[in-house]
């Protein structure tokens, strides 16, 4: 094995840039494996697991950049290094910035009218940069993760005192005055404001609102821990107030994974007091509360979008609600062999994984996952599926030192082949997320592997059902229609929404009396 190691002292690049560069580096001819990352302890741990950690790399400091190249046999590592370093130059030249500043303070001084900072830095420095932005009267979207709960609480308290947004940490989705930040979809402007403690959940809600003829005024992300007991929903509470006073917003929709009970009560109390109608979608398996005056509840993202657009004036009778295709369900059941009884979910989006998993759990037992709220059914080994298994490839379990699957789907692609070889698997469920920040061709990057997976099953005399959901709109690039057609041409069954994905998957595998 021929390995080239370069350490660039005090050379910082944000995680989003490094994810993109690392993905492109691994596609270069002659590269067996390339690792481009900051020298954090977490990233060193990844190198150790790969057998690439050397004493030299071990001594590198957090602010140092590591480039590790494992070239294929006969490859020239020096030339590969030149090509990888050129990727940094391309990244710098393609940026839309007009100037560079050493600090947030100096940027604010030169652009005094600016009011928002998007921060993606090493988690060790993220709180410091976010605090500096808030002190300069800037709203903050903090993409960085690995920020302590204590720092998050302090930042959100400071933002609250100053009347500013503190979106994050680990906030990946927002739409502010029509501009999508980090991950987001091209949706029409409208009068529905979204507050989301869930990235892909917020994207899904915005996309369904768009499909149903509504539009989005603002989408404010809070970060996934906002509704925890320690944070207390500070950002969601403040965001409700901001949207209540936003002249562009007439309806407010809230979405989150299950919040802490005390925080849920606090948020609902604030929602009841809001002068504008509020739709609440807290994804879980519990009973959906009864609607109240000015406050409506939704069991899933599709229902939340429907209620929001109806409040905005859209008539339900004019909508295609995509009811389940019963003839299709019967046909799929007939095509499965008796031993095929399990669902395997391979997801990029955490909320999409949750919503599908919860739907299956309503009808079937033995549902395992790396994000299962029930410890009894949380996977002990994420590399081995058990019975019904749902994997969130965007969780830290899989992204530790690696790009998010919405940017680089490599991890999920290899797992697809592994699951296809299991004769007890009936259905594999996959999501494909379009939009700003995502892979430029998510379906195209996976389609050949999908064909290979189906061929593996066919060679053993069984049919592997692949059920896919494409999260996107007609305005996204690539388009929803183009990506969907590629899947249909490969014999993949398409679901029309995240909600319908779970409902279809659970029905496909029903046998005997269950059916």
UniProtKB/Swiss-Prot annotation:
Molecular-function GO terms, alphabetical: succinate-CoA ligase (ADP-forming) activity; succinate-CoA ligase (GDP-forming) activity
| Entry GO terms, CC | cytosol; succinate-CoA ligase complex (ADP-forming)
Which Pfam families has this protein been placed in? CoA_binding, Ligase_CoA
UniProt GO BP: tricarboxylic acid cycle
Q: Quote the Gene3D superfamilies the UniProt record gives.
A: NAD(P)-binding Rossmann-like Domain (3.40.50.720), Succinyl-CoA synthetase domains (3.40.50.261)
Among NCBIfam families, the record links this protein to: PRK06091.1
Q: Its family? A: Belongs to the AllF family.
Q: Which PANTHER family match?
A: PROTEIN FDRA, SUCCINYL-COA LIGASE SUBUNIT ALPHA
Protein name from the UniProt record: Uncharacterized protein YahF
